[in-house]
Amino acid sequence: MKSLITLILTLFLFVGCSSDSEVIPPIMPYSYSTTELDLINKVNDYRTTNGLSNLQPVDHIGYLCSEHNQNMINTTVVGHHDFESRINNLKMTMGAARVSELVAGNFSTNQSVMSAFLNDPLCKKILDEQDRNRIGVAVSISPTGRKYYTLIIIN
């Protein structure tokens, strides 16, 4: 009986006191639409015109952008809800040191959303950051026809 109690206590100590290691999320595939690729090209055209390097599209970042768009569609709120989880995901999966997110809603064209980003000082500052090298984009349309945009830029 004493050995059974010792065994149970030992198992508890190994199981109950083991460290929780973080689980690295899977890297998800994503296929960019023509509209999304056009928006990435507009971002890169702006950057090269201003002496900055192109941002490389990454499928996993696009997937996270698409997930965020679905959240914005479901809540009808354009914002950065749960941005911290996207930051943590990209740090663990992509080794991102810095993560920035741009969101927009209800613009009819990529050119109009780019103009809005460039007219907003904070968004423009993000687009102008030299140390960024990767991008993900999603453009989603709600059942009511409203467009939602998420761009995530990392280094």
Which functions belong to the PLM regions below?
Residues 1-10:
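Sec-dependent signal peptide recognition
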Residues 13-16:
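C-terminal motif of bacterial Sec signal peptides marking the signal peptidase cleavage site
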Residues 23-74:
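A short alpha-helix/helix-coil micro-patch that ends at or immediately precedes a cysteine
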Residues 37, 41-45, 62-70, 101, ...:
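Solvent-exposed, polar/charged alpha-helical surfaces in well-ordered, non-transmembrane soluble domains
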Residues 48, 97-99, 132-133, 147:
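Loop/turn elements at helix/coil->beta-strand transitions in domains of secreted/extracellular proteins
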Residues 49-63, 76-87, 124-140:
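Surface-exposed patches in mature extracellular/periplasmic domains of secreted proteins
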Residues 66-111:
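Short, surface-exposed glycine/acidic/tryptophan-bearing loops
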